Amino acid sequence: GLGTLFMLISIHPTHPQPRQLSMVVDCLQSGGVIAYPTDTIYGLGCSIFKQDAIEKICAIKKVDPEKANLSFICADLSDLSLYAKSIDNSLFRILKKALPGPFTFILPASKEVPKILQSRKKTIGLRIPDNLIALSIIKTLGHPILSASFPGDEVEEYTDPELIQENWGKQIDMVIDGGIGGITPSTVVDCTTDHYEIIRQGAGVWDY
């Protein structure tokens, strides 16, 4: 960890400061685990290319990486299409309408997706949140970050960055304060078959 010195870092929600962003990116590049705001609830994140950090998040969640059905967030649609294989035109149009937004799309994983993140069915959850802090972190880092939920059901604990630091500060390296988060997770849509199926109804209203 980076010690408690850099633990809670405030980033402006509409004008993220480059200096803070580069501190977050340094943390991610050194294999750190962060808590960060999205367009829904706060997430646990790390670089998708740091296997130790992914394993650490799975340990916090008490899940086996193979069974965890992990997701990550991309900067934009061209980034997303690197990590998903076979997105046809009609699905692409839907993604274009729905994103950035509070959805997680389950798609067939391309070979660019690190093995540890692929489910047994070779799928991956992909997300482009409508949150400038999260998107700026990925753009500065240059590749996606994991998007994992905190364990447990006490949703209030995961909306307030200061409470997150109090509860989880010993297990994660940095908490990003981007203001109070939402309490409803993203809507999860399985797009691996012809009939798109809502697996979890969340903040995103599906009318496509």
Q: Over which residues does each language-model region extend?
A:
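Active-site-adjacent structural elements in enzyme catalytic cores
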Residues: 6-208
